Amino acid sequence: MIDFITFCDYTGTFAFAISGIRLASAKQFDWFGAYVVGVVTAVGGGTIRDILLNAVPFWMEQASYLIVSALALLFVIAFRKYVIRLNNTFFIFDAIGLGLFVVVGIAKTLDFGFPMWVAIVMGTITGSFGGMMRDILINEEPLIFRKDIYALACVFGGLIYYICMQTSMSAAMIQFVSALSVFLARIIAVKYHISVSVLKGEE
């Protein structure tokens, strides 16, 4: 039986890959190009995290992440009528992947013995940098740099993780609550049009 953090890792990979493939399809990429975008979305943030932690990037040790991304492509192809045509498909899968990857990044960083503030930074990188790479590949302004609550949702989830660590909650419950808080922060921010003020320069 897999532990909760492994479940988060693979589920997040699947969700993020779908979000990348969904956007690639909107740009009329072929299936291979869409797969590449999906893989980059799924492993990009974790790769940067591992490099900063002086670790071998996780997907180089386990090809299963590339296989999960391929399954995401097959999922989109099989259910393209629903996945591609529904406008909120990208948002939902992206929010799911964001929340799950934040806790994966935090947990791995803590396992390496780093302090909590570093773990929150790494959780934010794990959650948001794959999406940044995705947006660059498809020639879009990275979502992380827009006024949307995106990276801040990751930081919020990290703070919730830290607060929960001060309680008697199990590790799995802490990770679940943290991931859920990131997901809900994204949903609420979009639903109620909550955003960060834009820094305007002189015209």
Residue positions per predicted region:
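Cytoplasmic-side transmembrane-helix entry/capping segments in multi-pass membrane proteins
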Residues: 32-40, 62-66, 87-98, 122, ...
